[in-house]
């Protein structure tokens, strides 16, 4: 199985390798006067590949007139008015933008009668053979290792068939489908044998959330509990990952186990932390024998002894710890992560949603405020679709009651709007999207919670900025493309505040992609300011936080802010101000813990790791990486 890494640490999804292979196959088939037969999935990781193929078609360097497409799977059973048909998604994302002939597009029938399902599947297999078999299969991967809709337990001999959708896949599908319609219980899917019959197979995966499963697929033994692992048996299978999705592969995470290394400070730190965890010792107790017995003899040659390497990495980690995230005034900052001057600093904390600031760095925000820095918080999106309908109902009951109590129900706008929204919710179907008025009310609820949290953290309300970036306001899970308008809104705030410190989300495992888009908007605005020669940028540092969906690996941490038990409690209180995001919040992800519990667990785990390595023992720690 061939593994190709593309992109950078900031998850640039370069799909040209896959597009090159497909384009070459199409052109070769055209030269020979043959069809080029493709099995195509609809996973989000394939979007970038489809966009690249569309670009080549639009530039007139590639035609798809000889291409035959077979949809890899379809939901079953579908209602006639269903918006869930995967073939429609495939057309919307790809096929309708190129010149594939309509008569050459085939899909399994999600409407077929149950007693005709087997015949439908058998006919699909025969039709593939009629065209000479599959030339290429282009697929993504689910969290359980499923490919197409082949759930764990699917055998290597399995062919096109009806299969029950597993709970993990269902959760993933519900999160990714751009509709509130209930996912059907089953799928009609190409089998493992069908996919492996393709001459070439491409599997693409992007992002941190795929790192764990990709390590198992590529490096673990073949097993039917991990259907994608059967790709190891294919003579021309290509796994294409970005660095985030490849993060747990041995060659990336522990390269010293497979090759000689170029030993950077970060890699040495990673190796020593791994060694400490493997043998259960703190850094300063590691010996030459420990290094030699665990494949790290190169470091002994580099540093001369275990003692020298231990001291170097211990000091590096020690210097990441600071109780002064804005820099300690009038102090030697040689070994501190932040400079002492200027003091006080102007700080902007960019928060993708209206609670990410306190979830990810609530303790650090309080510390910055207490140490007299000029702290601004910028909430980049409204977060409106993450508010449940019952929250709107509760607030509408309140305002209607307020109208009755103090205005004798004379405010007809409130009365009419109350009745209108009450009627809408009473008739609302699962697949219905909210009206613009309801989305506005939901955004207002989140604004109120954010203001309450900021007041609790002693941030003046004139330092609280609601940017409402336009890309978010689709009313759906899938957002609009980021545009210059989004960037200009962020840039205007930067020009107004002229910060010495900027905090942005580095939590790119957010399953809906909002964090990445928000961070991209900030970095794009900074690039524009750089081009314009902005003076304030010469004395500004950018720090990236995590916490809502993942935590920084210790080899990457450059600043770690310790929290006492009291400070951790205050952080929890800040998060709890966001009441709409507690148990009933729509998008808690596949982690059953509430966000305050996730944050505390991650912060405590970071502190525990520092303690195990022989450094100071704290209740919790918030970690940051500098963006350079």
Model-flagged regions — what are they?
Residues 1-7, 12:
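Single conserved hydrophobic/aromatic residue that forms the stacking wall/gate
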Residues 4, 62-136:
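Ligand-binding beta-strand-loop-alpha-helix segment within the catalytic cores
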Residues 40-45, 139-143, 206:
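Glycine-rich beta-strand-to-loop/alpha-helix junction loops that act as flexible
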Residues 49-60, 358-382, 386:
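Histidine-anchored nucleotide/phosphate-binding helix
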Residues 49-55, 147-159, 512-528:
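Short Gly/Thr/Asp-enriched flexible loops that form oxyanion-binding sites at enzyme active sites
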Residues 148-192:
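Class I SAM-dependent methyltransferase SAM-binding "motif I" and its flanking Rossmann-like core
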Residues 172-178, 182-187, 279-348, 367-371, ...:
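Metal-dependent de-N-acetylase/amidase catalytic core
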Residues 190-193, 199-294:
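ATP/nucleoside-binding phosphotransfer catalytic cores, i.e., glycine-rich phosphate-binding loops
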């Amino acid at each position: 199985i061939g593994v190709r890494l593309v992109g950078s640490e900031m998850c640039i999804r370069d799909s040209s390798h896959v597009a090159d292979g497909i384009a070459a196959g199409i052109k070769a088939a055209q030269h020979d006067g043959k069809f080029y037969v493709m099995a195509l999935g609809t996973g989000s990781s394939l979007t970038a590949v489809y966009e690249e193929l569309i670009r080549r078609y639009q530039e007139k360097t590639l035609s798809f007139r000889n291409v035959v497409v077979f949809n890899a799977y379809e939901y079953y059973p579908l209602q006639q008015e269903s918006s869930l048909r995967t073939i429609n998604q495939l057309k919307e994302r790809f096929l309708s933008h190129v010149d594939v002939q309509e008569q050459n597009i085939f899909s399994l029938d999600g409407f077929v009668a149950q007693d005709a399902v087997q015949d439908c599947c058998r006919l699909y297999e025969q039709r593939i053979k009629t065209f000479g078999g599959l030339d290429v299969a282009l697929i993504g991967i689910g969290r359980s290792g499923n490919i197409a809709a082949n759930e764990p337990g699917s055998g290597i001999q399995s062919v096109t068939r009806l299969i029950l959708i597993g709970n993990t896949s269902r959760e993933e599908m519900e999160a990714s489908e751009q509709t509130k319609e209930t996912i059907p219980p089953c799928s009609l899917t190409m089998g493992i044998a069908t996919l492996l019959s393709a001459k070439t197979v491409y599997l693409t995966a992007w992002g941190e959330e795929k790192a764990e499963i990709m390590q198992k697929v590529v490096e673990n033994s073949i097993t039917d509990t991990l259907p994608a692992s059967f790709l190891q048996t294919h003579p021309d299978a290509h796994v294409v990952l970005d660095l985030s999705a490849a993060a747990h592969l041995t060659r990336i995470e522990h390269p010293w186990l497979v090759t000689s290394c170029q030993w950077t400070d970060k890699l040495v730190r990673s190796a020593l932390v791994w060694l400490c965890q493997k043998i259960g010792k703190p850094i300063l107790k590691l010996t030459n024998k420990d290094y030699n017995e665990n494949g790290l003899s190169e470091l002994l040659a580099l540093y001369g002894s275990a003692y020298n390497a231990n001291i170097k990495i211990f000091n590096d980690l020690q210097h990441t710890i600071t109780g002064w995230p804005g820099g300690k005034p009038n102090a030697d900052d040689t070994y501190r992560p932040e400079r002492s001057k200027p003091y006080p600093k102007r700080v902007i904390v960019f928060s993708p949603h209206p609670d990410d600031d306190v979830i990810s760095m609530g303790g650090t925000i309080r510390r910055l405020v207490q140490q007299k820095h000029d702290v601004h918080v910028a909430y980049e999106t409204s977060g409106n679709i993450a508010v449940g309908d019952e929250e709107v109902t509760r607030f509408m009951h309140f305002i209607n009651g307020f109208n009755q109590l103090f205005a004798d129900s004379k405010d007809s706008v409130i009365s009419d709007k109350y009745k209108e929204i009450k009627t809408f919710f009473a008739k609302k179907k699962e697949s219905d999207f909210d009206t613009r008025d309801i989305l506005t009310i939901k955004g207002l609820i989140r604004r109120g919670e954010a203001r309450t949290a900021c007041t609790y953290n002693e941030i003046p309300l004139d330092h609280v900025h609601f940017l409402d970036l336009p890309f978010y306001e689709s009313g759906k899970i899938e957002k609009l493309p980021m545009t210059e308008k989004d960037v200009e809104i962020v840039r205007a705030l930067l020009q107004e505040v002229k910060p010495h410190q900027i905090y942005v989300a580095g939590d790119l495992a957010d399953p809906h992609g909002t964090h990445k888009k928000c961070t991209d908007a900030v970095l794009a605005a900074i690039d524009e300011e750089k081009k314009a020669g902005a003076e304030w940028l010469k004395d500004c540092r950018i720090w990236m936080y995590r916490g809502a969906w993942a935590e920084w690996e210790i080899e990457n941490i450059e600043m770690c802010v310790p929290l006492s038990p009291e400070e951790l409690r205050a952080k929890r209180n800040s998060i709890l101000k966001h009441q709409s995001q507690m148990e009933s919040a729509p998008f808690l992800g596949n982690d059953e813990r509430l966000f305050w519990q996730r944050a505390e667990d991650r912060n405590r785990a970071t502190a525990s790791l520092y303690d195990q390595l022989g450094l100071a023992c704290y209740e919790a720690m918030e970690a940051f990486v500098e963006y350079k």
